[in-house]
UniProtKB/Swiss-Prot annotation:
PROSITE patterns: SOMATOTROPIN_1, SOMATOTROPIN_2. Its main location: secreted. The modification Phosphoserine is found at S26, S34, S90. One of its GO terms (biological process) is response to nutrient levels. This is Prolactin. Prolactin acts primarily on the mammary gland by promoting lactation. GO terms for molecular function: hormone activity; prolactin receptor binding. Interacts with PRLR. It comes from Camelus dromedarius. Gene3D superfamilies: 1.20.1250.10.
């Protein structure tokens, strides 16, 4: 659903509507990420011991994100909103390359490719929605566009199959992790900002 009909002038969507859409979208992205990870795991990672290697090597690890709801509760909502923006921006580049590289895989499974394309598209929509939310919650605040730079493209293009598959596995593992965090942060922010923490 487009937030404003095309050509609409001064279209104002309520903050509650924006949050509703953002929460639905982030939940959808997390579901797709989980499905894509599970599909990849089943098809390519069996018996390769990837999980034990994939600990704490996400490109967004440099952004200190709260690990659970209790930690997130301690963070001021302005900082949490900015953190969500940073994590979403940090995924623009890797998602673009993920789609390109999956397309180039031999017998690229449609179950993985179609989800990668959809996630890239929806991540952009969620980022736009979050920028609108920040604009309403803190009008006039110029948010600096800080994000974590991803440098994993060479590993997705390695000639060695094991190394390449592990790079894909790790990226999908991180995507699932981060999409889960964003989903939780947005639910928490919606509760705080829209319902004054009465939920």
């Amino acid at each position: 659903l487009p937030i404003c009909p095309s050509g609409a002038v001064n279209c104002q969507v309520s903050l509650r509507d924006l949050f509703d859409r953002a929460v639905i979208l982030s939940h959808y992205i997390h579901n797709l990420s989980s499905e894509m990870f599970n599909e990849f795991d089943k098809r390519y990672a069996q018996g390769r011991g990837f999980m034990t290697k994939a600990i704490n090597s996400c490109h967004t690890s440099s952004l200190s994100t709260p690990e659970d709801k209790e930690q997130a509760q301690q963070i001021h909502h302005e900082d949490l909103l900015n953190l969500v923006l940073r994590v979403l921006r940090s995924w623009n580049d890797p998602l673009y390359h993920l789609v390109t590289e999956v397309r180039g895989m031999q017998e690229a499974p449609d179950a993985i490719l179609s989800r990668a394309i959809e996630i890239e598209e929806q991540n952009k929509r969620l980022l736009e929605g979050m920028e609108k939310i920040v604009g309403q919650v803190h009008p006039g605040v110029k948010e600096n566009e800080i994000y974590s730079v991803w440098s994993g493209l060479p590993s997705l293009q390695m000639a060695d199959e094991d190394t390449r598959l592990f790079a894909f596995y790790n990226l999908l593992h991180c995507l699932r992790r981060d999409s889960h965090k964003i989903d939780n942060y947005l639910k928490l922010l919606k509760c705080r900002i829209i319902y004054d923490s009465n939920c």
